Curated annotation (Swiss-Prot):
Protein's job: Probably a ribosomal protein or a ribosome-associated protein.
Key words, A-Z: Ribonucleoprotein, Ribosomal protein
Assembly behavior: Part of the 30S ribosomal subunit.
Name this protein carries in UniProt: Probable small ribosomal subunit protein cS23
Record-linked InterPro entries: PSRP-3/Ycf65_sf, Ribosomal_PSRP3/Ycf65
GO molecular function list: structural constituent of ribosome
GO biological process, one term: translation
Origin organism lineage: Bacteria, Bacillati, Cyanobacteriota, Cyanophyceae, Acaryochloridales
Length: 99
């Protein structure tokens, strides 16, 4: 995922996912945030990434696999754990939030 950054907004009742594209030394938003479980964040992210036909399928699958891991962790145990633990578990993901 070196060309892309998975960003996660970690909240008490929801988790939200977005993707940025790495541009030079910074990044540029590629998608908006999609919320789980309020909406189907994974499906929304998949649909949005598929619209960007210039993203290689291998990269798209890698992003979606990491999104799946983050959502599963949040559902199973993460929402009851501090944000610092999520950051340690997924060092390649950019986290922000209040939980």
């Amino acid at each position: 995922m070196s060309k892309f950054i998975l960003k996660v907004l970690w909240l008490d009742e929801n988790v939200a996912l977005a993707v940025d594209q790495v541009v030079g030394n910074g990044s540029s938003p590629l998608t908006s945030y999609f919320f789980w479980p309020r909406n189907d964040a994974w499906e929304n992210l998949k649909t949005e990434l598929e619209k960007k036909t210039w993203i290689d399928e291998v990269e798209r699958i890698s992003i979606l696999n990491k999104a799946t891991e983050v959502i599963n962790y949040w559902q199973e145990e993460g929402r009851r754990r501090p944000l610092t633990e999520a950051k340690a578990r997924f060092p390649e993901v950019v986290f922000t939030g209040t939980a």
